[in-house]
Amino acid sequence: MSSVVVVGTQWGDEGKGKITDFLSENAEVIARYQGGNNAGHTIVFNGEKYKLHLIPSGIFYKDKICVIGNGMVVDPKALVAELSYLHEHGISTDNLRISNRAHVILPYHLKLDGLEEERKGANKIGTTKKGIGPAYMDKAARIGIRIVDLLDRDVFAEKLARNLEEKNMLFEKVYGVEGFRHEDIFEEYYEYGQQIAKYVCDTSVVLNNALDEGRRVLFEGAQGVMLDIDQGTYPFVTSSNPVAGGVTIGAGVGPTKIKHVVGVAKAYTTRVGDGPFPTELHDEIGDRIREVGREYGTTTGRPRRVGWFDSVVVRHARRVSGITDLSLNSIDVLTGIETLKICVAYRYRGEVIEEFPASLKVLAECEPIYEELPGWTEDITGVRSLDELPANARHYVERISQLTGIPLSIFSVGPDRSQTNVVRSVYA
């Protein structure tokens, strides 16, 4: 049995899609365990770029099973569109499996997401407005509609009617807007359910059988540890658990079956949306990193906020996710910057803090303590091993590994999968 979990160690957008795609080559099953179509990943396959939001990136390999786990929230309309997009490009989806226990995002979730964000005004979270939060709210309130319900015409009709009664009262009395009629949603979404029915099963059985048979299973996290609802910068977080522990709940696989946890980080830090960001840059260097690194959201197109690498953040991610391997991406983006900085700790009211604080009030007053390192000017995009890196680039990479306490297993010097280099196998 060999299982690997891929998690983001920062605020998402660390390049997990590319690393998952790279590791998928040696995996037999690839599964997502949380989130929904709020997560976007770009995959380059046969020289062509694909953008996926729901379906695991292993779908491009005909011999691999791809799983949408029970911990995900699925927008059936978005899923059917993504399936069509893949079919139009000649990509088979026969090996897709969708959990019958995953929850469904419906039009009222999308509407609520947008209205609630507007209502918050200056206190908005920076949601992608994909209905993720409201769908997880219904799940926690035990009124959610699951995939298994969507496939049963009578059950779906009854649950939808009950939910619309409550949601329409909310729309009309609280937000002062028109609600939905049953017929606005029912037939369209029931039909989406029928279109995906052939993929639906108990995915926990699929995954556990694969592990028991000794197959290599790769679990693909979305977002990042700092967006985890428990361990992230709450409330500026997602509504699920991207941490590695989320696999046990969101995929139905016991904790004893997780062997390796790969933490993916950029050689700098980015964040989309609102919330604290201690090492954020508001200068020419920040603008340069954003442009060279093409730091714009896959899902939203929004420019990402950019900052120096923060080892306090990644150490926190290591601890709460049990990270065993570091995958460091986008090292090439820093080429040409004369002096690089790594945050090693925070200073709060004269005191040095080495662990990430829970209080956003404290965090807002924290000043990053930086270690400066010399940059490099050499082109590193063709580098294939640590030994080939210029001395300063290698020192920078190794210093990040030292400061975070995570052994380096993979490093990347460009967006293409051929620019991804293995230092040690994560399947060992």
Swiss-Prot record:
Q: Which residues does the annotation say bind GTP?
A: 12-18, 40-42, 304, 330-332, 412-414
Gene Ontology MF terms in the entry? adenylosuccinate synthase activity; GTP binding; magnesium ion binding
Q: Give the family this protein belongs to, as stated in its UniProt record.
A: Belongs to the adenylosuccinate synthetase family.
Q: Where in the cell is it found?
A: Cytoplasm
- InterPro entries, alphabetically? Adenylosuccin_syn_GTP-bd, Adenylosuccin_syn_Lys_AS, Adenylosuccinate_synth_dom1, Adenylosuccinate_synth_dom2, Adenylosuccinate_synth_dom3, Adenylosuccinate_synthetase, P-loop_NTPase
- Family annotation (Gene3D superfamilies): Adenylosuccinate Synthetase, subunit A, domain 1 (3.40.440.10), Adenylosuccinate Synthetase, subunit A, domain 2 (1.10.300.10), Adenylosuccinate Synthetase, subunit A, domain 3 (3.90.170.10)
Q: What is this protein called?
A: Adenylosuccinate synthetase
Q: Which residues form a coiled coil?
A: none
Please list the residues that bind Mg(2+).
13, 40
Q: Does the keyword Nucleotide-binding apply?
A: yes
Name the species this protein comes from: Geobacillus thermodenitrificans (strain NG80-2)
Instruction: Name the cofactor(s).
Output: Mg(2+)
Per UniProt, the keywords (alphabetical) are: Cytoplasm, GTP-binding, Ligase, Magnesium, Metal-binding, Nucleotide-binding, Purine biosynthesis
